[in-house]
């Protein structure tokens, strides 16, 4: 009769990886809830317009998730082998792919927001609010791909807790700035949908800064590698 043995060390390590990722996903979901709650409290049209506009970001995230999933799978294998050269090449390729995707979505949202909103609605009011949101939020789309690459690299090097902390801090600041800019506070006038977009942009800038800062600390992958010279020259 076979007996089932539990490797407590394995499950403890698995738990330390699972919990930060769960917390990170929960915090990201809270941003959407906060946006809907705050904007919906002012005007249902604000909430509807932003909900439609953020569908574009959802599509972008699908492309970025595919690229970063490949980075995570291959990167974890090479991290286990301590093949730093391969990690260097994979990270450089992921940065390039995510950079191209981010630039394409930025250009589309910054210069053609009205055409994008027409895909989702014909209501002039919703289109106008959506355009106001996308013109500001588009700059955050330019940064998202890069920060996701750095966060994945932190997870690969067994620093999922740090990645979750970066995302959680970013989300909390986003929610606070939402309240400040949407409702108006500390001498700042109410900016409604533009306030939500500005809060998103500032939080994304902070997320990228924190991700880069932590990623190059001793013990993290990026303290050991550098972006390949050919890829760096070929980047946008």
Predicted segments — roles?
Residues 39-58, 125-129, 193-195, 232:
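Interfacial/gating helices of multi-pass transporter permease domains
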Residues 47-111, 144-163:
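Small-residue-rich hydrophobic transmembrane alpha-helices
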Residues 225-236:
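Single conserved hydrophobic/aromatic residue that forms the stacking wall/gate
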Residues 1-2, 201-225:
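C-terminal transmembrane helix end/exit motif
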Residues 1-26, 232:
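N-terminal membrane topogenesis motif
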Residues 104-135, 183:
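Short membrane-interface helical motifs at transmembrane helix boundaries
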Residues 26, 30-48, 117-124, 180-191:
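Helix-terminus/linker motif at the lipid-water interface of multi-pass membrane proteins
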Residues 172-208:
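Membrane-interface helix-loop junctions in multi-pass transport and translocation proteins
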């Amino acid at each position: 009769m076979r007996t089932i043995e539990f490797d407590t060390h394995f499950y403890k390590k698995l738990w330390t990886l699972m919990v930060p990722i769960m917390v990170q996903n929960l915090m990201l979901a809270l941003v959407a809830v906060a946006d809907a709650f705050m904007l919906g409290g002012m005007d249902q049209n604000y909430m509807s317009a932003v909900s439609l506009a953020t569908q574009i970001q959802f599509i972008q995230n699908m492309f970025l998730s595919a690229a970063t999933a490949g980075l995570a799978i291959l990167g974890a294998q090479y991290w286990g082998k301590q093949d730093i050269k391969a990690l260097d090449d994979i990270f450089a390729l992921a940065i390039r792919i995510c950079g191209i995707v981010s630039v394409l979505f930025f250009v589309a949202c910054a210069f053609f927001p009205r055409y994008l909103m027409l895909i989702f609605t014909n209501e002039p009011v919703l289109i106008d609010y959506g355009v106001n949101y996308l013109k500001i939020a588009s700059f955050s789309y330019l940064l998202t791909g890069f920060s996701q690459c750095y966060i994945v690299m932190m997870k690969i090097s067994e620093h999922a807790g740090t990645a979750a902390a970066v995302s959680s801090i970013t989300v909390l600041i986003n929610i606070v700035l939402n309240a400040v800019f949407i409702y108006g506070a500390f001498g700042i006038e109410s900016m409604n949908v533009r306030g939500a977009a500005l809060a998103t942009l500032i939080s994304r800038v902070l997320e990228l800064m924190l991700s880069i800062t932590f990623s190059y600390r001793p013990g993290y992958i990026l303290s050991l590698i550098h972006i390949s010279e050919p890829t760096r020259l070929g980047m946008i």
